[in-house]
Amino acid sequence: SIALLAMALNELGCHATSLTGWQAGFRTDRAYTKARITKLETERISSELERNRVVVVAGFQGLNKLDDITTLGRGGSDTSAVAIAAALHADRCQIFTDVEGVYTADPRKVRNTRKLDEITFDEMLELASLGAQVLNNRSVELAKKYNVELEVLSSLNPVPGTVVKEVVKD
């Protein structure tokens, strides 16, 4: 799908390139189906960006020390996106998903839930530990560590989402 997206962008006149996880520089440990990112070598991504190209990266995968392809497990694509944002010193990482943001409860299961405009990293980690599946713990922990705000947005509906950050204004 990364190659198809890059091809579609190129057809629209937007210079794009696609990279697998290992081409993008994701290095992981050896836990094949739930690997952790140990290093992100951003030279290739940076080189493409310097050439004014849109870089479409396959999330969820990397390469271990034995040059074996690994997968990051549940939420691996979100974690990959946050890792790239942190490595490139971005202020914010947008995560597009099937919901319009973070809610007080799962709107598919509970009536009268409220979408949150903002939430702290710690509050999001608490929700995730209680079963919220909007963002997984690894991506939120990484965003908190590198102070990269997360913006949860809907892939289906262009409405404001939820910003996950260090401090929320009262």
Q: Language-model features: where?
A:
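Proteins with a high burden of low-complexity, intrinsically disordered sequence enriched in S/T/G/P/A and R
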Residues: S1, A6-M7, L153-L156, D170
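A broadly conserved detector of short glycine/acidic/proline-rich loop/turn motifs that flank catalytic sites
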Residues: F60-Q61, V99, S154-L156, V168
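Generic structural hydrophobic/aromatic packing signal, biased to beta-strands
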Residues: S18, M124, L150-V152, V164
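Nucleotide/pyrophosphate-binding catalytic subdomain
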Residues: S1-V140
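Short, solvent-exposed polar/charged micro-motifs at secondary-structure junctions
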Residues: T28-D29, G161-V163
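Conserved glycine-bearing catalytic or ligand-binding loops at nucleotide- and phosphate-handling centers
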Residues: A132-R138, L142-P160
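A conserved regulatory-domain signal marking ACT and ACT-like small-molecule sensing domains
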Residues: V163-D170
